UniProtKB/Swiss-Prot annotation:
Listed InterPro entries: LAAT-1
Keyword match Phosphoprotein: yes
Modified residues (Phosphoserine): 465
Basic and acidic residues bias (residue ranges): 464-475
Regions that span the bilayer: 30-50, 62-82, 89-109, 136-156, 180-200, 260-280, 295-315
One of the record's GO cellular component terms: membrane
Membrane topology: Multi-pass membrane protein
Ranges facing Cytoplasmic side: 51-61, 110-135, 201-259, 316-475
Protein name: Transmembrane protein 44
Region (Disordered): 390-475
Compartment annotation: Membrane
Amino acid sequence: MGEAPSPAPALWDWDYLDRCFARHRVCISFGLWICASSCWIAAHALLLYLRCAQKPRQDQSALCAACCLLTSLCDTVGALLARQLTIQVFTGAYLAAIDLVNFMFILFPVCGSKFKSNSDREARERKRRRQLRASVFALALPLSLGPCWALWVAVPKASATIRGPQRRLLASLLQENTEILGYLLGSVAAFGSWASRIPPLSRIAPPPTLGITTQHEIWRGQMSKPSQSPSRSPSGHWRAAAQRQVLGTEMCRGKTFPSIHLWTRLLSALAGLLYASAIVAHDQHPEYLLRATPWFLTSLGRAALDLAIIFLSCVMKSKMRQALGFAKEARESPDTQALLTCAEKEEENQENLDWVPLTTLSHCKSLRTMTAISRYMELTIEPVQQAGCSATRLPGDGQTSAGDASLQDPPSYPPVQVIRARVSSGSSSEVSSINSDLEWDPEDVNLEGSKENVELLGSQVHQDSVRTAHLSDDD
């Protein structure tokens, strides 16, 4: 025959503790509860440090904190009425005290008040008064349950017995069945503890990665801007734009928890698992487990939801690192790598550009300079090539002229761009054709500073050309 289930001990049954530690046999249930309590204390200490040491954030509203406090009170009162274990009553009382302190900190923030800004003082005061009214109402609701329950229990019962059939009032039915009321309060506490983990879960949202849409937006933003100086890095602008885009999207669509907050969640989940193990380790009979089902499900549900919050937060942080470029470069998309590689190559080419050969028409400063000069005079740019030891090919003809090798200058490297402008000058008394070769480096000419001189030179060349044409017609 099976062993009869042991009756639940009273709240202050010292014989139970004596039997638990008798003959050097440590009670497993009590030891697991001690470990769970240590984890809870460490988690709440970290939360207090996080609230006071860092800039405060309104992670939890006053109404949510009031619901958590009401849940803890229901858990404690339900364990007391249902004649549960002493460790369950103490655990509920401790969690209720912690929720009360948290609720008071939300109502009257003491730590971190120096971080508040002084802007929009009136709007902040109105919001504070509105929150204070809602918080006082939420505080009065759970605190009124204790005195009402005490008055309800203190009502004396009628000593006279009434014979015959009669109706039983609901109050007398509840007074005679306090264990049923305790189980109901335990069930309410279980659902309330699960619901208190929904706001942190809704706060977490997967961030968008740096995909094709973001790259097109960055490209359009860069193309719409005016041309920048070559000294500024295009890749730096693209990276900065990408980071601003991803950070703005992260602020709108998802928020992460600090590392300390994740550690508190982990300790709380571990404490919940140890607490559930302590309840199960006390007695394994089905009758006892059925009576302790609300508190057992409460601890397991909170632990599972805390682990889910930790997992989702870690996944979101890893995606954020990948989107911001802190992950490996191999994980980046091909479009991102192509954009950044082209920008870096263009920057290196602009920095290492010391000279431009005559055979190459670059599209940088020299091209812009020649384009500006071509509006005023006709230029002929031809490279000077050495045909032999004493023969040089002159620009403008296809023949070579022999010259003294000793009088020729050695070719300079890199070659200097030679601009030959044929200017004919004449006067009214005599006609003399002077072919002058003007040599200068377009890189040394500041067209923007001497625009008037270039216009004057162009007009003079035009007048001389007209005079030469008239004299040729007269001859």
